[in-house]
Each structure stands twice: as structure tokens, then as C-alpha cells.
A protein has these predicted regions:
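Alpha-helical transmembrane segments and their juxtamembrane interface "caps"
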Residues: 1-182
Length: 182
């Protein structure tokens, strides 16, 4: 069910990117990259503030995670809060970028409005959506609750989003896991 929902979101994302056109979608890709960079500067301090606001499920005996080694189990709360902080900072910066994108939409794009340009825009839109979904799923993967872990592990699409996307998987693991808990 999760796999179907994720694929549906990605298909919808392709359609939206196809309708927007290449110029606007390239702008949104740049806004995503810039937002990811700036979120990387603020996420740790934000994550520390969430310890009292957002509860984290304590790991229980015999329960682990499918996506992180067992020796990191008792430090995953740091990754969870850092992920929440990063996602919040990313959302704020990306929202500013989307607001500015309203003006990019005014640029005439008649010359690059062909079918292949629109397909390229759809692919870029899927890439942006994939990054956001990967952040959300990686945050969920840190929660040591059996229902969450089993749901993510049974979903082929979610499992590949968390572990197998070439560039962003390493980026997220580097800033959320390696930088925080080694």
C-alpha cells in the first residue's frame, strides 16, 4: 500500500512538472538545491530545540531498525531530531523559493515548450519530489517502532528510496548520520 501511494505521488509529480514547463521546473530544482544547502546550516540547532516538543519512541528490547545498524539504535534520536530540524528548515527556505517562483512563471517560454522539454520538466519534478519523500521516509526509518519498521521494510519503493537513490542517499546519511553519530 505504501509503495502504491509513493508511486502515485511520483506520477502526480511528473504530471505537475510536465504542465509547468522546463523553465519553472529548473528554477524549482535550483530552489531545492539552495534550500538543501541553507537547511544544512541550520538543522542542528533546530533539531536540539525539538527534544522537548516532539516525543521520540524509546527503543525496546528485541526491536531494531532495518535501515540502521544495531549499534546506532540508542543514538537514532539525534538523527530523528536532526532530520526534523532539517526538514523544517528546508521547508521554510523552499517555501520562500516557491514564492519567488511565482515571478519566474511570468517569463515567456514559447521557444522551449515542446514535448521533450516538458518530459524533462516532469523528470526534474520527480527528482525534487523524490528528495522530499526520501527525507520524510529516512526520518520515519529512525523510529524504533515495530509497526513503522515493518511497514517501511515491506514497501519495496520506500526501501529503495531510503537506501538506493545515488546522490541524495549519501548526502542525507552524511549530514544526518555520519556527522552526528559517526
Amino acid at each position: 500500500m505504501i509503495s502504491f501511494l509513493l508511486l502515485l505521488i511520483l506520477a502526480w509529480s511528473f504530471y505537475i512538472g510536465y504542465r509547468r514547463g522546463l523553465v519553472l521546473q529548473v528554477y524549482y530544482l535550483v530552489a531545492t538545491i539552495v534550500s538543501a544547502y541553507f537547511a544544512g546550516n541550520f538543522y542542528q540547532s533546530l533539531g536540539e530545540k525539538f527534544h522537548l516538543l516532539i516525543p521520540y519512541a524509546n527503543p525496546k528490547e528485541g526491536i531494531g531498525t532495518f535501515f540502521f545498524p544495531s549499534d546506532q539504535l540508542f543514538q537514532l534520536d539525534k538523527v530523528f531530531y536532526a532530520g526534523i530540524g532539517y526538514l523544517l528548515a528546508f521547508t521554510v527556505f523552499y517555501s520562500i523559493g516557491r514564492l519567488l517562483g511565482l515571478f519566474v512563471n511570468l517569463i515567456p517560454t514559447d521557444k522551449i515548450d515542446g514535448k521533450y522539454f516538458r518530459i524533462g520538466a516532469g523528470v526534474l519534478s520527480v527528482g525534487v519530489t523524490l528528495f522530499v519523500l526520501q527525507m520524510i521516509l529516512t526520518i520515519l526509518a529512525t523510529v524504533p517502532l515495530e509497526v513503522v519498521q515493518n511497514s517501511l521494510e515491506k514497501s519495496i519503493v520506500a526501501k529503495h528510496m531510503i537506501q538506493s537513490i545515488p546522490i541524495t542517499t549519501n548526502f542525507i546519511k552524511q549530514i544526518w548520520v555520519t556527522k552526528l553519530i559517526g
